[in-house]
Amino acid sequence: MNMEVSSSADEHVAEHYIIEPQEISEMVKPDKTVKILIVEDNPEMRKVLTQIFEQIYEVYTAADGQEGLERASSLQPQMIVSDIMMPVMSGLEMCEKLKSNLQTSHIPVVLLTARNREEHTLEGLQTGADDYISKPFNIKILVARCNNIIQTRKLLQQRFVRNDEPKVEDLPFNPIDKKMLMDATAIVESYIDNPDFDVATFAREMCMSRTLLFTKLKALTGQTPNDFILSLRLKKATEKLRNDPNALIADIAFDYGFSNPSYFIRCFKNAYDITPAAYRRKYANS
């Protein structure tokens, strides 16, 4: 199978390219929970890209940058693959708008650019694109690079879910998303001893709607706002257990916003598969 699609053949690409589903599905495990948005003005190329990615992801399409911008906001896909040269709004302009808007700044964007157009590559990186693929491109490489970005995001989410939070400043997110996570962490920590701190208060302090707060935290950390709050409470509790061997378990529970010690112990064991007392003994002996 000829795996390259050239920019000069865009108008008749379907005539020159036959998609073999088995090759793609063998490369990447299908996951229909992943939404991918393809933004491409050429109908033939849009059809080919759809046929490639629909084998592994849930695919949506847009015919230009303006439509892509609107669909990205409503769909909240896990990935956008976009051509650069399009009518109404270019892929570069769309990418810049996506990456500068808190509602969509977390969505990875891969741009397709013509070969030997280094200015497009530079502009794409400057507008915040996560990757770029030059035409003519190898379909297997396109699929692999898109999948790598998606899997990297999933691995980061799993670290948060496992209460193994990485340092925000070390995360491969853009400045808007890093600031959002740092602000969210600071707000939760400021209410850390308050058992009545809830998602409504969290959203108000973040100056966000509850829906946007949920969308952002879920996309960046894999956690709901309630899970994010709980994980930070537990993380602070583990630090206290390690650093203060004389602190009572009940006092630690109340200090970090748990309404009663029993609830704290249950949450701690669910998260770390060990009780707070056993956790303290483990680190005291290490």
List the predicted regions and their residue ranges.
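Charged docking surfaces used in two-component/phosphorelay signaling
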Residues: 47-52
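Acidic, metal-coordinating helix/loop segments flanking the phosphotransfer/catalytic sites
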Residues: 61-79, 242-244
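Receiver (REC) domain active-site loop signature in two-component systems and cognate sites
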Residues: 86
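C-terminal output helix
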Residues: 137-146, 150
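Terminal helix-turn-helix DNA-binding modules in bacterial transcription factors
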Residues: 219-259, 282-286
